[in-house]
Amino acid sequence: MTMNSKRQWLKFAGGSTLAALAVSSALVGCGKKEEAAAPVAAPASAAVVTKPEPLKVAFAYVGPVGDGGWTFAHDNARKAVEQEFGDKVVTSYVEKVPEAADAERVFRDLVGQGNQLIFGTTFGYMEPMLKTALDSKDVKFEHATGYKQTDNLRTYDSRTYEGAYMAGVIAGKMTQSNTLGVVGSIPIPEVIRNINSFALGAQSMNPKVKVKVVWVNEWFNPPKETEAAQSLINGGADVLMQNTDSSAVLQTAEKNGKYAFGWDSDMTAYGPKAHLGSAVINWAPYYIASVREALDGKWVAGAGKHAWWGVKEGAIDMVSIAEIVPADARAAVEKVKAGLKDGSFSIWKGPLLAQDGKEWLKKDEVADDKVLSGINFYIKGVEGKVPGGK
């Protein structure tokens, strides 16, 4: 029954009741006084179903949504949340939020707007999010790539080093100069892991390779990324990987007739001749799972509540591998994927040497997540020094 038909029924019912009361009154007036008419009950009101208010979910991004990389991947996942839950959620985002003191203002503003679940998508939001969370106990917070948690703040990450390893497998096969290059963003464990993993993947196919690194100390700065990529090419690198957010590295490789990989998102379109494959992150499975927990009242935070998803969970992949990549490299990538999914393969299994030649992992020793979370040095085969590290 539509709302209009409900209103018409109530109008009809009300009119009929009044008519019935009038007739009863007339009959009482003509009959015995002791036979008063029994009171007529008013019609029951139609049951009103109250629709639950949608869950308000907000995202804070360090870069623009159109960066083609990191932020683009997060925003695609936000859209996937909307598609999954429909009118049960309302999402919003703020882009280009700097990793600085002003980030706290942004998070407090998101709280003030009534958001119930807030995602901060870069490492530098850690302290601003923690401060805001401690003052906003009725709001749920999730911080990407961080490590500090509290009762209403938990952390999550993707095993991007798995994508870096697969890129290394391809790079080790494709290089002619045996020199690979990486444009690094911020020298934190997350990025250092990726550089080392890229080197290990390359060494698995070509023990002669060496890896050079140029740091730009920013996540998104296309001019700096371009300059760094050109510097690596000038230094002999013929295959590049990046841990930055724009497509500048791939575009620079294309202009120079070299090879490169997409990072975080599929970047094929930005340099189709240079593109060997893209190490992508799919944040959608995690965001959908987290929002579902919040909707179902099962969302839990606290010390140790950290999710770290990779190939196994469908969060990491190597996609759009170029046709020029040889069959044996393609097969090696697929073997790595299968091993990561079923746990039969570990990237961080000894014997592995640090850059200075000292043993880091003994034979068959496997670095656990705690060790990987604090890595601040290069492995053997990576040149240069980690800024502020070893």
Residue locations for each model-derived region?
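Residues that mark the N-terminal boundary/hinge immediately upstream of a DNA-recognition element
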Residues: N4-K6
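Alpha-helical transmembrane segments
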Residues: A20-S24
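C-terminal motif of bacterial Sec signal peptides marking the signal peptidase cleavage site
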Residues: A26-G29
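A residue-level marker of the well-folded mature domains of exported/periplasmic proteins
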Residues: K32-K390
